[in-house]
Protein backbone atom coordinates (compact mmCIF):
# COMPACT_ATOMS: atom_id res chain seq x y z
CA UNK A 1 0.00 0.00 0.00
CA UNK A 2 2.87 2.36 0.81
CA UNK A 3 4.39 1.66 -2.61
CA UNK A 4 1.11 2.56 -4.28
CA UNK A 5 0.98 5.86 -2.43
CA UNK A 6 4.51 6.69 -3.53
CA UNK A 7 3.81 5.92 -7.18
CA UNK A 8 3.84 9.02 -9.37
CA UNK A 9 1.01 9.63 -11.79
CA UNK A 10 3.27 9.22 -14.82
CA UNK A 11 4.26 5.75 -13.63
CA UNK A 12 0.91 4.58 -15.00
CA UNK A 13 1.40 3.51 -18.62
CA UNK A 14 -2.31 3.96 -19.35
CA UNK A 15 -2.26 7.57 -18.16
CA UNK A 16 1.01 8.35 -19.95
CA UNK A 17 -0.28 7.20 -23.31
CA UNK A 18 -3.71 8.74 -22.71
CA UNK A 19 -2.29 12.22 -22.17
CA UNK A 20 -0.04 11.72 -25.19
CA UNK A 21 -3.14 10.96 -27.28
CA UNK A 22 -4.79 14.17 -26.06
CA UNK A 23 -1.91 16.52 -26.86
CA UNK A 24 -1.00 14.69 -30.08
CA UNK A 25 -4.57 15.16 -31.30
CA UNK A 26 -4.26 18.89 -30.61
CA UNK A 27 -1.17 18.98 -32.82
CA UNK A 28 -2.94 16.97 -35.54
CA UNK A 29 -5.61 19.68 -35.65
CA UNK A 30 -2.93 22.37 -35.88
CA UNK A 31 -1.03 20.66 -38.69
CA UNK A 32 -4.28 20.22 -40.63
CA UNK A 33 -4.74 23.99 -40.86
CA UNK A 34 -1.04 24.59 -41.54
CA UNK A 35 -1.30 23.00 -45.00
CA UNK A 36 -5.00 23.31 -45.79
CA UNK A 37 -4.48 26.11 -48.33
CA UNK A 38 -1.94 24.25 -50.46
CA UNK A 39 -4.46 22.14 -52.45
CA UNK A 40 -6.71 25.21 -52.76
CA UNK A 41 -4.21 27.37 -54.67
CA UNK A 42 -5.74 26.78 -58.14
CA UNK A 43 -9.19 27.50 -56.71
CA UNK A 44 -8.00 30.65 -54.97
CA UNK A 45 -6.83 31.93 -58.35
CA UNK A 46 -10.04 30.94 -60.11
CA UNK A 47 -12.67 31.84 -57.50
CA UNK A 48 -11.07 34.65 -55.50
CA UNK A 49 -8.76 36.01 -58.23
CA UNK A 50 -5.58 35.57 -56.22
CA UNK A 51 -2.30 35.31 -58.10
CA UNK A 52 0.95 33.54 -57.22
CA UNK A 53 2.31 36.70 -55.58
CA UNK A 54 -0.75 36.88 -53.31
CA UNK A 55 -0.41 33.22 -52.40
CA UNK A 56 3.34 33.56 -51.76
CA UNK A 57 2.70 36.58 -49.52
CA UNK A 58 0.04 34.64 -47.64
CA UNK A 59 2.07 31.47 -47.11
CA UNK A 60 5.14 33.44 -45.98
CA UNK A 61 3.04 34.88 -43.15
CA UNK A 62 3.51 31.70 -41.12
CA UNK A 63 6.99 32.84 -40.15
CA UNK A 64 6.47 36.59 -39.81
CA UNK A 65 6.05 36.81 -36.05
CA UNK A 66 8.01 33.66 -35.24
CA UNK A 67 11.12 34.85 -37.10
CA UNK A 68 11.10 38.64 -37.15
CA UNK A 69 9.49 39.22 -33.74
CA UNK A 70 11.29 36.24 -32.14
CA UNK A 71 7.97 34.94 -30.83
CA UNK A 72 9.20 31.35 -30.61
CA UNK A 73 12.04 32.43 -28.34
CA UNK A 74 9.68 34.44 -26.15
CA UNK A 75 7.25 31.53 -26.24
CA UNK A 76 9.96 29.22 -24.95
CA UNK A 77 10.78 31.63 -22.13
CA UNK A 78 7.09 31.91 -21.22
CA UNK A 79 6.86 28.12 -21.27
CA UNK A 80 9.76 27.80 -18.84
CA UNK A 81 8.42 30.57 -16.59
CA UNK A 82 4.68 29.85 -16.62
CA UNK A 83 4.51 26.12 -17.29
CA UNK A 84 2.82 23.89 -19.84
CA UNK A 85 -0.79 24.52 -18.80
CA UNK A 86 -0.72 28.30 -19.19
CA UNK A 87 1.44 28.28 -22.31
CA UNK A 88 -0.40 25.42 -23.99
CA UNK A 89 -3.84 26.94 -23.49
CA UNK A 90 -2.57 30.30 -24.69
CA UNK A 91 -1.12 28.68 -27.80
CA UNK A 92 -4.40 26.86 -28.50
CA UNK A 93 -6.37 30.09 -28.21
CA UNK A 94 -3.94 31.81 -30.60
CA UNK A 95 -4.48 29.00 -33.11
CA UNK A 96 -8.26 29.31 -32.84
CA UNK A 97 -8.17 33.11 -33.14
CA UNK A 98 -5.79 33.02 -36.10
CA UNK A 99 -7.91 30.42 -37.88
CA UNK A 100 -11.05 32.43 -37.17
CA UNK A 101 -9.51 35.56 -38.71
CA UNK A 102 -8.36 33.55 -41.71
CA UNK A 103 -11.85 32.10 -42.17
CA UNK A 104 -13.40 35.56 -41.92
CA UNK A 105 -11.02 36.88 -44.57
CA UNK A 106 -11.62 34.03 -47.02
CA UNK A 107 -15.40 33.91 -46.52
CA UNK A 108 -15.99 37.67 -46.77
CA UNK A 109 -16.46 39.60 -50.01
CA UNK A 110 -14.54 42.86 -49.70
CA UNK A 111 -15.13 45.96 -51.84
CA UNK A 112 -13.39 45.73 -55.20
CA UNK A 113 -10.02 47.43 -55.06
CA UNK A 114 -9.81 47.37 -51.24
CA UNK A 115 -6.12 47.20 -50.37
CA UNK A 116 -4.09 46.88 -47.18
CA UNK A 117 -0.28 47.12 -47.09
CA UNK A 118 -0.14 46.91 -50.89
CA UNK A 119 -2.11 43.67 -51.16
CA UNK A 120 -5.79 42.86 -51.48
CA UNK A 121 -7.62 43.34 -48.18
CA UNK A 122 -8.66 39.69 -48.22
CA UNK A 123 -5.10 38.46 -48.78
CA UNK A 124 -3.64 40.66 -46.03
CA UNK A 125 -6.24 39.69 -43.42
CA UNK A 126 -5.89 36.01 -44.29
CA UNK A 127 -2.11 36.35 -43.99
CA UNK A 128 -2.43 38.10 -40.63
CA UNK A 129 -4.65 35.29 -39.35
CA UNK A 130 -2.15 32.73 -40.63
CA UNK A 131 0.71 34.59 -38.93
CA UNK A 132 -1.13 34.56 -35.58
CA UNK A 133 -1.96 30.90 -36.07
CA UNK A 134 1.71 30.21 -36.85
CA UNK A 135 2.76 31.60 -33.48
CA UNK A 136 0.18 29.44 -31.74
CA UNK A 137 0.98 26.17 -33.49
CA UNK A 138 4.75 26.52 -33.08
CA UNK A 139 4.49 27.37 -29.38
CA UNK A 140 2.05 24.48 -29.02
CA UNK A 141 4.68 22.26 -30.61
CA UNK A 142 7.40 23.10 -28.11
CA UNK A 143 4.87 22.89 -25.27
CA UNK A 144 3.88 19.38 -26.31
CA UNK A 145 7.57 18.42 -26.49
CA UNK A 146 8.01 19.57 -22.91
CA UNK A 147 4.87 17.70 -21.88
CA UNK A 148 6.31 14.50 -23.34
CA UNK A 149 9.56 15.02 -21.42
CA UNK A 150 7.55 15.63 -18.26
CA UNK A 151 5.49 12.44 -18.58
CA UNK A 152 7.95 10.09 -20.29
CA UNK A 153 11.35 11.03 -18.82
CA UNK A 154 13.19 7.81 -18.01
CA UNK A 155 10.61 5.81 -19.94
CA UNK A 156 9.64 5.57 -23.64
CA UNK A 157 10.38 9.24 -24.35
CA UNK A 158 11.76 9.01 -27.91
CA UNK A 159 8.97 6.64 -28.94
CA UNK A 160 6.41 9.04 -27.48
CA UNK A 161 7.93 11.95 -29.41
CA UNK A 162 7.91 9.87 -32.56
CA UNK A 163 4.27 8.90 -32.14
CA UNK A 164 3.30 12.51 -31.43
CA UNK A 165 5.05 13.69 -34.58
CA UNK A 166 3.52 10.85 -36.61
CA UNK A 167 0.05 11.84 -35.36
CA UNK A 168 0.70 15.47 -36.26
CA UNK A 169 1.80 14.43 -39.75
CA UNK A 170 -1.51 12.64 -40.18
CA UNK A 171 -2.96 16.15 -40.03
CA UNK A 172 -0.73 17.17 -42.95
CA UNK A 173 -1.83 14.17 -45.00
CA UNK A 174 -5.50 14.80 -44.23
CA UNK A 175 -5.12 18.44 -45.28
CA UNK A 176 -3.63 17.46 -48.63
CA UNK A 177 -6.16 14.70 -49.31
CA UNK A 178 -9.46 15.98 -47.88
CA UNK A 179 -9.38 19.72 -48.57
CA UNK A 180 -10.51 19.74 -52.20
CA UNK A 181 -13.24 17.09 -51.67
CA UNK A 182 -14.58 19.19 -48.79
CA UNK A 183 -14.57 22.35 -50.91
CA UNK A 184 -16.37 20.49 -53.72
CA UNK A 185 -18.87 18.80 -51.42
CA UNK A 186 -20.04 22.15 -50.05
CA UNK A 187 -19.83 23.88 -53.43
CA UNK A 188 -22.79 25.36 -55.27
CA UNK A 189 -24.08 25.98 -58.78
CA UNK A 190 -24.91 29.56 -59.73
CA UNK A 191 -27.86 30.73 -61.83
CA UNK A 192 -25.80 30.39 -64.98
CA UNK A 193 -25.13 26.73 -64.28
CA UNK A 194 -21.46 27.20 -63.36
CA UNK A 195 -20.18 25.20 -60.39
CA UNK A 196 -18.21 27.03 -57.68
CA UNK A 197 -16.15 25.33 -55.01
CA UNK A 198 -16.71 26.46 -51.44
CA UNK A 199 -13.20 27.54 -50.45
CA UNK A 200 -14.13 28.66 -46.89
CA UNK A 201 -15.62 25.22 -46.05
CA UNK A 202 -12.31 23.40 -45.37
CA UNK A 203 -11.10 26.34 -43.28
CA UNK A 204 -14.31 26.28 -41.23
CA UNK A 205 -13.78 22.54 -40.78
CA UNK A 206 -10.27 23.33 -39.48
CA UNK A 207 -11.70 25.91 -37.10
CA UNK A 208 -14.08 23.32 -35.65
CA UNK A 209 -11.22 20.82 -35.35
CA UNK A 210 -9.04 23.38 -33.58
CA UNK A 211 -11.83 24.06 -31.09
CA UNK A 212 -12.04 20.32 -30.40
CA UNK A 213 -8.24 20.18 -30.12
CA UNK A 214 -8.32 23.04 -27.62
CA UNK A 215 -10.90 21.15 -25.56
CA UNK A 216 -8.61 18.09 -25.68
CA UNK A 217 -5.72 20.16 -24.33
CA UNK A 218 -7.97 21.67 -21.67
CA UNK A 219 -8.82 18.14 -20.51
CA UNK A 220 -5.10 17.41 -20.40
CA UNK A 221 -4.49 20.30 -17.99
CA UNK A 222 -6.39 18.45 -15.26
CA UNK A 223 -4.07 15.46 -15.58
CA UNK A 224 -1.08 17.78 -15.59
CA UNK A 225 -2.24 19.40 -12.36
CA UNK A 226 -2.60 15.96 -10.77
CA UNK A 227 0.89 15.03 -11.97
CA UNK A 228 2.32 18.16 -10.36
CA UNK A 229 0.60 17.21 -7.10
CA UNK A 230 2.06 13.69 -7.23
CA UNK A 231 5.53 15.08 -7.91
CA UNK A 232 5.17 17.55 -5.04
CA UNK A 233 4.24 14.67 -2.77
CA UNK A 234 7.50 13.00 -3.78
CA UNK A 235 9.45 16.19 -3.10
CA UNK A 236 10.28 16.59 -6.80
CA UNK A 237 10.03 19.75 -8.89
CA UNK A 238 7.18 19.46 -11.43
CA UNK A 239 9.17 21.47 -13.97
CA UNK A 240 12.73 22.76 -14.08
CA UNK A 241 12.90 26.44 -13.08
CA UNK A 242 13.92 28.97 -15.72
CA UNK A 243 17.36 30.54 -15.36
CA UNK A 244 18.79 33.32 -17.54
CA UNK A 245 22.14 31.55 -17.69
CA UNK A 246 20.40 28.71 -19.56
CA UNK A 247 20.09 31.03 -22.58
CA UNK A 248 23.83 31.71 -22.53
CA UNK A 249 24.53 27.99 -22.25
CA UNK A 250 22.32 27.23 -25.25
CA UNK A 251 23.74 29.87 -27.60
CA UNK A 252 27.32 28.88 -26.73
CA UNK A 253 26.66 25.19 -27.30
CA UNK A 254 28.10 24.07 -30.65
CA UNK A 255 25.88 20.99 -30.73
CA UNK A 256 22.80 23.18 -30.54
CA UNK A 257 23.85 25.18 -33.59
CA UNK A 258 24.64 22.06 -35.61
CA UNK A 259 21.22 20.60 -34.85
CA UNK A 260 19.57 23.97 -35.58
CA UNK A 261 21.39 24.17 -38.94
CA UNK A 262 20.23 20.67 -39.83
CA UNK A 263 16.63 21.64 -39.01
CA UNK A 264 16.88 24.84 -41.08
CA UNK A 265 18.16 22.92 -44.10
CA UNK A 266 15.48 20.27 -43.68
CA UNK A 267 12.66 22.77 -43.34
CA UNK A 268 13.86 24.85 -46.28
CA UNK A 269 14.09 21.74 -48.48
CA UNK A 270 10.75 20.12 -47.67
CA UNK A 271 8.09 22.48 -46.37
CA UNK A 272 8.13 25.17 -49.10
CA UNK A 273 7.64 22.33 -51.60
CA UNK A 274 4.51 21.15 -49.79
CA UNK A 275 2.97 24.63 -50.04
CA UNK A 276 3.20 24.54 -53.84
CA UNK A 277 3.16 20.79 -54.46
CA UNK A 278 -0.54 20.41 -55.28
CA UNK A 279 -0.43 23.32 -57.72
CA UNK A 280 2.71 21.83 -59.30
CA UNK A 281 0.83 18.59 -59.93
CA UNK A 282 -1.91 20.55 -61.73
CA UNK A 283 0.23 22.98 -63.73
CA UNK A 284 3.11 20.73 -64.79
CA UNK A 285 1.66 17.23 -64.81
CA UNK A 286 -1.98 18.13 -65.56
CA UNK A 287 -3.30 16.10 -62.64
CA UNK A 288 -6.98 16.56 -61.82
CA UNK A 289 -7.18 19.24 -59.07
CA UNK A 290 -9.40 16.89 -57.06
CA UNK A 291 -6.52 14.39 -56.87
CA UNK A 292 -3.52 16.74 -56.98
CA UNK A 293 -3.23 17.02 -53.20
CA UNK A 294 -3.20 13.25 -52.78
CA UNK A 295 0.23 12.87 -54.42
CA UNK A 296 2.16 15.24 -52.07
CA UNK A 297 -0.11 13.93 -49.32
CA UNK A 298 1.84 10.69 -49.57
CA UNK A 299 5.03 12.51 -48.52
CA UNK A 300 4.31 12.46 -44.76
CA UNK A 301 3.41 8.74 -44.85
CA UNK A 302 7.08 7.82 -44.50
CA UNK A 303 7.36 10.05 -41.43
CA UNK A 304 4.19 8.56 -39.97
CA UNK A 305 5.65 5.06 -40.24
CA UNK A 306 9.37 5.62 -39.62
CA UNK A 307 9.40 8.33 -36.92
CA UNK A 308 7.96 6.08 -34.17
CA UNK A 309 10.20 3.26 -35.40
CA UNK A 310 13.37 5.33 -35.05
CA UNK A 311 12.08 6.75 -31.76
CA UNK A 312 11.69 3.26 -30.34
CA UNK A 313 15.14 2.35 -31.67
CA UNK A 314 16.66 5.39 -29.95
CA UNK A 315 15.01 4.39 -26.66
CA UNK A 316 16.61 0.95 -26.96
CA UNK A 317 20.13 1.65 -28.26
CA UNK A 318 20.75 5.39 -27.98
CA UNK A 319 23.23 6.56 -30.65
CA UNK A 320 21.25 9.71 -31.45
CA UNK A 321 24.02 11.23 -33.60
CA UNK A 322 24.19 8.10 -35.75
CA UNK A 323 20.42 8.09 -36.23
CA UNK A 324 20.53 11.77 -37.24
CA UNK A 325 23.15 10.99 -39.88
CA UNK A 326 20.99 8.13 -41.19
CA UNK A 327 17.98 10.44 -41.33
CA UNK A 328 19.97 13.10 -43.18
CA UNK A 329 21.15 10.55 -45.76
CA UNK A 330 17.57 9.34 -46.25
CA UNK A 331 16.48 12.94 -46.84
Locations of regions flagged by a protein language model:
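Extracytoplasmic gate region of multi-pass secondary transporters
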Residues: 37-41, 253-304
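C-terminal ends and interior cores of transmembrane alpha-helices
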Residues: 93-118, 329-331
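Central cavity-lining transmembrane alpha-helices of secondary-active solute carriers
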Residues: 60-77, 297-310
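Helix-loop-helix hairpin linking two adjacent transmembrane segments in secondary transporters
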Residues: 164-225
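Flexible cytoplasmic inter-helical loops of multi-pass small-molecule transporters
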Residues: 219-245
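Extracytoplasmic
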Residues: 18-52, 273-278
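Cytoplasmic membrane-interface "Motif A"-like loop-to-helix N-cap segments
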Residues: 80-92, 315-328
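Cytoplasmic helix-loop-helix junction between adjacent transmembrane helices
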Residues: 123, 129-167
Amino acid sequence: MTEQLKQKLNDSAVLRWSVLALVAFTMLCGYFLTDVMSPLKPMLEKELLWDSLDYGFFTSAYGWFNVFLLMLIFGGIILDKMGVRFTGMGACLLMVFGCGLKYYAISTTFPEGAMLFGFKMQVTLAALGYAIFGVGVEIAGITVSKIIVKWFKGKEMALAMGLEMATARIGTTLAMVLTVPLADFFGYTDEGGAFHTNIPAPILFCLVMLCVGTIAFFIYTFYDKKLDASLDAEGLEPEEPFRMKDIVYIITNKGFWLIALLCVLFYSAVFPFIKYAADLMVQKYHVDPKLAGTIPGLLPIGAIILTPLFGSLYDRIGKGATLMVIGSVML
